[in-house]
Design a protein with these regions (language model features):
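Fe-S-dependent hydro-lyases/dehydratases of central metabolism
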Residues: 1-130
Length: 130
């Protein structure tokens, strides 16, 4: 199952701009389809909610995590750990170079076992600034 393939709250929408189609997750639609009251969430929490909707797959992001955001409105606290998956990661050289070295070492170890090293990649796009 690929990320975002669940769409439990039927929030996936499409918009056409200059003849090109773009998909997005509508918080208004999610609110209509079970996430009551989310329009009252602070903007920072809405960003987290949109990210959860985008990556819901029942493996890394579950419906329970999404509902925990809605439930936060009642109690202003939650014991549920939620996933956050940024679209892009920016690394400076102090953190980026060791990460690249780790990836290279993992690829080399996999290659030595006669396996395909190509799947060993970051889940998110990464920019390394040196």
């Amino acid at each position: 199952m690929k990320p975002g393939s669940k769409n439990s709250f039927k929030s996936l929408r499409q918009i056409s701009i200059n003849g090109k189609n773009y998909k997005y997750f509508s918080l208004k639609e999610a609110e209509k389809n079970g996430l009551d009251g989310i329009s009252k969430l602070p903007k920072s929490i809405k960003v987290l909610l949109e990210n959860l909707l985008r990556y819901e797959d029942d493996l890394t992001v579950s419906k329970k995590q999404i509902e925990a955001i809605k439930d936060w409105l009642k109690t202003k606290k939650s014991e549920t750990e939620i996933a956050y998956r940024p679209a892009r990661v920016l690394l400076q050289d102090y953190t980026g170079i060791p990460a690249v070295a780790d990836l290279a070492a993992m690829r080399e170890a996999v290659k030595e076992k006669n396996k395909d090293p190509n799947p060993i990649n970051p889940l998110s796009s990464v920019d390394l600034v040196i």
